[in-house]
Amino acid sequence: MSTLLNIDATEIKVSTEIDDIIFTSSPLTLLFEDQEKIQKELILESFHYHYNHNKDYKYYCNIQGVDENIQSIDDIPVFPTSMFKYSRLHTADESNIENWFTSSGTKGVKSHIARDRQSIERLLGSVNYGMKYLGEFHEHQLELVNMGPDRFSASNVWFKYVMSLVQLLYPTTFTVENDEIDFEQTILALKAIQRKGKGICLIGPPYFIYLLCHYMKEHNIEFNAGAHMFIITGGGWKTKQKEALNRQDFNQLLMETFSLFHESQIRDIFNQVELNTCFFEDSLQRKHVPPWVYARALDPVTLTPVEDGQEGLMSYMDASSTSYPTFIVTDDIGIVRHLKEPDPFQGTTVEIVRRLNTREQKGCSLSMATSLK
């Protein structure tokens, strides 16, 4: 199994409806009703695929009284992400698994997720799809500075790998090695792109970008980006929660440090190792769920969907993965909202509020895992 999967974005074959949506459509042109229709069709198709090709998942469905003749995607059994910490669940044949990716593992046991080539290609497609919220850029119009390792150094740690995939889409300079930030190289790379007259995109974990801002302040380094720079964060603050800034204060820090024209130039990405898709923000900093993913907020006790806009336990069904059934319930409390006309960015958004913090709430999810062991 190789962690150094060689993907050429120009050679990916678009052969199915889901691939057509992921690789060729734009999130800016799909109406909410169209997205909902696509979602139901693709999620049902994914369920039938995993039900018929994964005996462990089929068993899990059957003991809950569910067979392949379901009528609604809400009837699809979901399982807790904690299951991936204790079981190697995969639909793809072992010979087709490119790598077992792991969570960043801020504490405790790490999750292990199998991915085949098609799943990884579709993950890349979700990055390209989400980047369209920034605008339509040709390769020669935009260059990136990534405060992380390239994909050959990211190994199997998931979010480092996800963030490194941008190098397949645009010219990218990487300025972190072995978790050591080269601040001088980062600033030189930003200035080099600016001199070329190209659009700039700075990418990294929020804490690394926070450290860059403080480095620039300490060394009296100014960078007047104006309207020609995007900053994309991802991965959260992890073990640096004590130093974490709220979104408003973080936005303000970046606005001042880089002399940005507008807060819409700052975006955040959501992803987790058990999910095969990245959620990008629109210009209003709302994280959008692509139409091949079904997101719900569930009551932590009954595991039934709560009202639109209410807090609940986050659950996702992701049709893009062929290597494992992505029908999961997480340890995040969040809010799902549905945006319809006349909103300029129609679709479904998610807002992650916090992690579960009580044994009682976690027990609701963990008890489900025993059925798969």
From Swiss-Prot:
GO term, biological process aspect, one: bioluminescence
EC number: 6.2.1.19
Annotated metabolic or biological route of this protein: Lipid metabolism; fatty acid reduction for biolumincescence
Known catalytic reactions: a long-chain fatty acid + L-cysteinyl-[protein] + ATP = an S-(long-chain fatty acyl)-L-cysteinyl-[protein] + AMP + diphosphate
Keywords: ATP-binding, Ligase, Luminescence, Nucleotide-binding
Presence of the UniProt keyword rRNA processing in the record: no
An MF annotation (GO) of this entry: ATP binding
A Pfam family reported for this protein in Swiss-Prot or TrEMBL: LuxE
InterPro entries from the UniProt entry: ANL_N_sf (IPR042099), LuxE (IPR007534), LuxE_bac (IPR016671)
Record Gene3D superfamilies: N-terminal domain of ligase-like
EC supergroup of this enzyme: ligase
Similarity remark: Belongs to the LuxE family.
Protein role: Acyl-protein synthetase activates tetradecanoic acid. It is a component of the fatty acid reductase complex responsible for converting tetradecanoic acid to the aldehyde which serves as substrate in the luciferase-catalyzed reaction.
Record protein name field: Long-chain-fatty-acid--luciferin-component ligase
Organism annotation: Photobacterium leiognathi
Biological classification of the source: Bacteria, Pseudomonadati, Pseudomonadota, Gammaproteobacteria, Vibrionales
